[in-house]
């Protein structure tokens, strides 16, 4: 499956590693960060399948639209950084044809 996960972040250092670890099976994870003042960006950049871009927050919808405009995959999984993604759920998503 050609799938990109998108996460919107702002000061999520306490959540981001858990979420990105759960998405390690994916080839592409895009993090759109709203200029966090904590270690969110540094943590996310430590994952080899993650691309981090920063964009000033103006509207939630515009953050998602910006992220989606960058994605070339057929499928997009949109998540907040504090979502807990189980291995079973991700496996089921990846089995969709």
Predicted segments, located by residue:
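A conserved acidic beta->alpha catalytic loop
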Residues: 33-42
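Acidic donor-binding/catalytic loop of UDP-sugar-dependent glycosyltransferases
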Residues: 39, 61, 79-96
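Glycine-rich, basic loop-to-helix element that forms the pyrophosphate-binding segment
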Residues: 56-71
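Cell-envelope/extracellular polymer assembly enzymes that use nucleotide-activated donors
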Residues: 2-4
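Short, conserved SAM-binding/catalytic segment
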Residues: 45-50
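Short, well-formed alpha-helical segments that are part of the catalytic scaffolds
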Residues: 6-25
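Catalytic metal- and UDP-sugar-binding loop of GT-A-like glycosyltransferases, i.e.
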Residues: 32, 55, 79-81
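Short aromatic/hydrophobic "clamp" motif used to bind/position activated sugar donors
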Residues: 76
